[in-house]
């Protein structure tokens, strides 16, 4: 796999071990993919930004890259600040990339194309998930996310890898086949 997801505690407590393990396995990216609800404050986001820049620098020096994976909560305003914007505006673009989850950004009220335009080359990885009309997850191609339009911005995004995914499939093999077939039809 080109990337791995790790909890923030691994970065805080054993950054060198995380980097060494990822290099041994052959990952290109180490991705931090979750912030616990109690840590979703502006003060804590600012601490994470410092940590991400520091860890991103360690990764770069070791020949690997660091990225952050979004969910919907980064789009909820906190005292007039959208955490996703804070993360993108204040992390070093040469040290911190982002894995753009197209379902979660959409569910959070963000527009993937607008974010790609505003922050070019910051999203080298995408999670391809679809959203039903009721905002639940559905198989790719069966929902409301316009992947064909979004993929027109893959170069501006800096896209290197995308992952077809669904968090809650009733039959994972059926979901994988349907989603794969839907992406193939896009001829991207």
Task: Walk through the language-model features, giving the residues of each.
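Active-site acidic/histidine proton-transfer and metal-coordination neighborhood
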Residues: 4-97
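Histidine-acidic metal/acid-base catalytic patches
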Residues: 26, 81-100, 104-188
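Short, structured active-site "lid" loops
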Residues: 1
């Amino acid at each position: 796999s080109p990337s791995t997801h790790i909890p923030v505690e691994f970065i805080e407590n054993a950054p060198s071990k995380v980097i060494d393990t990822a290099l041994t396995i052959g990952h290109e990216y180490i991705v931090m993919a979750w912030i616990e609800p109690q840590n979703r404050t502006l003060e804590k986001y600012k601490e994470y930004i410092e940590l991400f820049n520091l860890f991103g620098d360690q990764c770069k020096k070791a020949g690997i890259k660091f990225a952050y994976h979004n969910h919907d909560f980064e789009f909820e305003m906190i005292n007039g600040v959208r955490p996703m914007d804070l993360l993108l505006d204040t992390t070093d673009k040469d040290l911190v990339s982002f894995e753009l989850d197209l379902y979660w950004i959409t569910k959070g009220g963000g527009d993937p194309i607008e974010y790609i335009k505003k922050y070019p080359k910051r999203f080298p990885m995408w999670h391809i998930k679809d959203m039903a009309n009721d905002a639940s997850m559905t198989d790719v191609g069966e929902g409301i996310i316009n992947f064909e339009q979004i993929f027109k911005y893959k170069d501006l995004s800096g896209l290197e890898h995308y992952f077809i995914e669904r968090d809650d499939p009733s039959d994972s093999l059926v979901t994988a086949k349907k989603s794969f077939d839907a992406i193939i039809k896009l001829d991207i």
